[in-house]
Amino acid sequence: FLRGNVKMEVGFTVAPNGTGFVANSTFMPGVTAEMVDWWFGWHSVGPDLRYKIWDPEDHYYARAMDPAYVLDPKVPNNQKTWGVTHDISEDIGLGVDPLKLSFKKPSDLGYDMSLIGTPGCATMVCAVGVSGSPAVMTHKVVNAEGGIWFKSHFWVGYGLDESGRIN
């Protein structure tokens, strides 16, 4: 995933065990990887409107449970989500669902950190969602002429067990 394209850029599938995989790739003109890094911290520590900007019809709020860490100027923008849980309200198609997103350092999910900041992956945001429908989320940003490709992968049905491992 970090080294280049994957077989499924857009679409979904259901595995034999009932879990799902969703992939999406969106070109965002005029956007940079640095903007994405900044936004992921910024949207969780201010008015609810900040999260609604992403999707005004389906996003209601996202609130960092440790705003002091997110606001700390010593923490680089690309690390402001690492280890922070967000309390979120949004609708992913089945009605409003409160969830908690536990953001992770990409290496916590097995990604090679040496590949982040390269042409194949300018930056990355990872989280594990806890809700009625748990999921693992990865957003990879690839620089492109005139903007970025924002590539999202969701592994639906996977969450954290008591030890903090993904199951």
Where are these regions (language model features)?
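Glycine-rich portal/gate segments that line the openings of hydrophobic small-molecule binding cavities
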Residues: 56-131
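Hydrophobic ligand-binding cavity/cleft-lining segments
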Residues: 1-75
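Short loop/turn segments at secondary-structure transitions that flank enzyme active sites
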Residues: 42, 60, 109, 156-158
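A residue-identity detector for tryptophan
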Residues: 38-42, 54, 82, 149, ...
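Beta-strand/loop substructures that line and gate deep hydrophobic ligand-binding cavities in soluble
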Residues: 119-166
